[in-house]
Amino acid sequence: MECHGDDTLKRSESEGMKEDLYIDYPAFKYSVHNVNGVTCTDCHADIKALNWDKEVPHPSSLAMVNCDICHEAQGEAYLDSVHKKAGGKGITIPCYACHGYHYVKHLEADSVYERENKICLKCHNPNNFHDWLPQKETHFAYVECAVCHAPDSPRYISLRFYDLISNKFLEAKDLLAALDTDYAHFMDKVDKDKNNVISLSELEDMVLLLRQKDIRGTFHGEIVMELVPSVHHINRGGANRACEQCHNPQSPFFEEVFIVLNKDDGTNERLKVERRVLESYYVNHFYAISGTRVRYLDKIGFALLIAGLSVVSGHLLVRIVTAPARRRKKEKKDEFSI
C-alpha cells in the first residue's frame, strides 16, 4: 500500500487512457480478502519479489488474477455458464466484473435490492425481459434473480426487522440492544421452549418486547440464495418459469425460514423460524398468493363468516319463537275479515 495508497497513481494505457491504480485502504481493510489474511501477492502471484531500486518495484504488466486458485468449486460451476460462454462472442466476463477487485465483501447480509444492484443490474435491465411475469416489480423487490435463474441452488426466506418509525432496517446490534442480549444469547432470550426454532408465538412475544422499548415495525421477508458455488451456473433458457413452485401451499421454497441478524463484516447470523411465522401479521410485507396465508386475515374472514351465520340463525330463531304469536294474529285477522 506504500505506493498504491497514493490516489494520484495512474498508468497510461495504449489507447491513451489512464488506468487508476489507487487502492482505498480503509475500504480494502474491511474486504473479505483482507479480513481473511489474503495478501496482495496471494492474488498477484507473479510478483515474486519487490526491487525498490526501480521506480516500479515489480513487473509493470501483471498476469490476470486467477480466482480459481482459491475458489475452485465456483470456477467449475462458472465454466458451463452463460456468462463464461459469452467469451465465444468476444465478451469477457471475469469474476471481478461482478464481484469487483479489492473491496469484495460478504453478500449474506445484503438485501435483494443490494445484491441485485451490486451484481446483476450492472449489465441487465430486468424490465426488458420479464413482460410475461405478473407483478414483476414485486418479484424484483422481494425475490433474488438467481432464485429463478439458478433453480437448482438452495434458497431460503430471509426475515429482517424493518423499523416503521425510522423507515429503515433496524441494525442487528440495535435490535439486540433493545432486547438486552447479544448474538450468542439471542435464542436464549427468544426461544422459550429451547427447541432451537422460533415459533409464531415466540416471534410475537419478541415484537411485544420491542414495542415496550418504543420500537415498532414489521419483518421484511425476501427469498434469497444460499451463496453456494452452483449460483454461478446460470444458463440461457434454464430459468424457472413455473409459478406454482412458489405459489403453492406446499411449496418447498417456504420450508427454510430464518431471522437474519447482520454483522459488521458482511456476514450474518441466521436463526431458524417455523414456517407458520409467514402467516403472522408482523410479516405483512411478504405474501405469495396460494403460497402463504396471513393468519389475522383468516381470523377476520372466520369472524365475518360467524357473524353472517349468527344473523341467519338469529333471524330463524326469532321466526320460530314468534311463530305462535304470528299465527294468533293471523287467525284474529281472518275472524275480523269474516
Predicted segment positions?
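C-type cytochrome heme-c attachment and multiheme electron-transfer modules
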Residues: M1-I338
